[in-house]
Each structure stands twice: as structure tokens, then as C-alpha cells.
Amino acid sequence: MLFEQIAANKRKTIFIILGFFIFVLMVGAAIGIIVWNNYLNGLILAAVIGAFYILIMVMSSSSVVMAMNHAKEVTSKDQAPVLWDTVESMAMVAGIPMPKVYIVEDASPNAFATGISPEKGAVAVTRGLLNKLERYELEGVIAHEISHIRNYDIRLSTIAIALVAVIAILSDLAMRMIFWGSLTGGRNNRKSDNNNSGGAQAIIYIVALIFVILAPIIATAIQFALSRNREYLADASAVELTRNPDGLIQALQKISGDSKKMEEVSASSESIYFASPLKSKKNKPGLFDSHPPISSRIERLENM
């Protein structure tokens, strides 16, 4: 059951990522139709901007994420021996280099990982998590975060965030070009061969325009769907490492029962946390939820 869940989650992720890239190209094609009456120009624009933005995002240092979330590096085992040993042992089991270790001075129990590859990985936990969890529960959480690093989830989420940003940029660019085109009479200079073709072009233009307007919303929903799927995969992978689903289950129960919200959370970092720092109590995932409901995660773990 465990390995079936892991395989199913990986397949689902591949479909989501492929769909995401196709969606970006569709947005580019729609913009090409709207602005130049030529979808190919839009495809090229989307591909160029997308490749450039993804490159910039992937090259960004994980230290930026740590700074945004007020995480301080643990530079020696003496500073946090239990945490250090747990990260070291889980990394060894996962077969990756030991990630850098950070602590966020916040009373709410939570954790996150960053780093686009296992060689550049880092794990951060809140002070509340260290104070609230037993050793075996902490192992479950750390195994979950180590799994994100081993599965290249941070790289995937970085690409997803970049693609959402690219779609927002393309959509905004299209609106500006339409505005300036309307002022200069750009589209009025395009003549149709006959009334029928002119009517068809108008319909295509309107459909493309609606698609471009809705694209940022749809892209955000796709990004969060990917995020929720990777959380399930990291849970399953954590059990593969610890061979103890109870530790992760009890950690999730304790975090769910804790009412404290994190004091300072970067909005752009919400999706990387172990559990939503906004403390959502939903039992069903919404389109714009970065995490699946904790009750759903526990149910899947209990069925392993």
C-alpha cells in the first residue's frame, strides 16, 4: 500500500507539471491571437519569458527563504542536539547529504525545508515544534521534510511558483498591449476578407481574451494542486524512511490541536511548511489551499 501511494503520487505530479507547461503555452498562444493575430508569436514570448523566469527562481539562494522566515542556522550539535541528531540520522537513511539545520523562534509547531537539490538542502523547525513533540514524533516530521528534499519537491514548487508568476506577467502584458492598441487603433487596421471570417475572428478574440483574464486564477489553482499532492507524497516517503506511521500521525494530531498561529509568516512561503501556518480547519481541500486537510493526511497514513 505504501509503495502504491508513492507511485500514484509521482504519476499525478508528472501529469500536473506537464499540464502546467502546456497551460503556459496556451496562455502565450491566446496572447499571440489577441495582440498579433498570430498564436506563434505568443508561444515564443511565453517560452522565452518562462525559461528566463524559471532560471532566475531556481538560482535564488535558499538563504533568502530562511531570512524571509526569520530562521537562524544551527551551526553545531551543541546548540540543538536532539534536532541535529534527528536530521543527521534521517538524512543518512534517505541517502542524501545532511541538510543545514535552522530554528525559527516561534511558539507555533511547524517546519519546512528548502534547497533545489539534496546537496543544497536545509531544514527549519520552529521552537514550538521542538517543545511540543516527542523524539519519535519529531523523527516523523523531519523525515517528511527530508523527503521533500530527496524528492526534489522544492525545485518543483519553485518552478510552479515561477510559472504562476510568468502567467501573471503575460496576462498583465496582454492587458497593457490591448489598452495601448485600442488607443492607437491597432486592431482596427486589421481587415477581414469577408464578414464571416471577421465574425469568426471576433469570437476567437473574445474567447482568447477571457482565457487570458482567467489564466492567473487557474494557474494558482494548479500550483496549489501540485503542492497538496507533494504533501501526500512526502508523508508516504516519510513512513518509508521511519517505518513508523504512528510518529507522523501523532505529530499531525498535536499540530492540528495547537491553536497558535505563526507570528510572522511570509505569504510566499506558506506552501513550503509542514502544515498550513494559517491553521485551516477544513476537512476537504479547497482549490486554493496549499495543504491537504490534516484529517485527510492522517487517514491516508492510517491506511498504510
From Swiss-Prot:
One of its GO terms (molecular function) is zinc ion binding. CDD domains: M48B_Htpx_like (cd07340). The chain crosses the membrane at residues 14-34, 39-59, 159-179, 202-222. Its EC number is 3.4.24.-. GO terms for cellular component: plasma membrane. Its main location: membrane. InterPro entries: HtpX_protease, Pept_M48_protease_HtpX, Peptidase_M48. GO terms for biological process: proteolysis. Its cofactor is Zn(2+). Pfam families: Peptidase_M48. Keywords: Cell membrane, Hydrolase, Membrane, Metal-binding, Metalloprotease, Protease, Transmembrane, Transmembrane helix, Zinc. Binds 1 zinc ion per subunit. It is found in: Cell membrane. It is a multi-pass membrane protein. The active site is at E145. Zn(2+) binds at H144, H148, E231. PANTHER family: PROTEASE HTPX. Belongs to the peptidase M48B family. This is Protease HtpX homolog. It comes from Listeria monocytogenes serotype 4b (strain CLIP80459). The lineage of its organism: Bacteria, Bacillati, Bacillota, Bacilli, Bacillales. The gene is htpX.
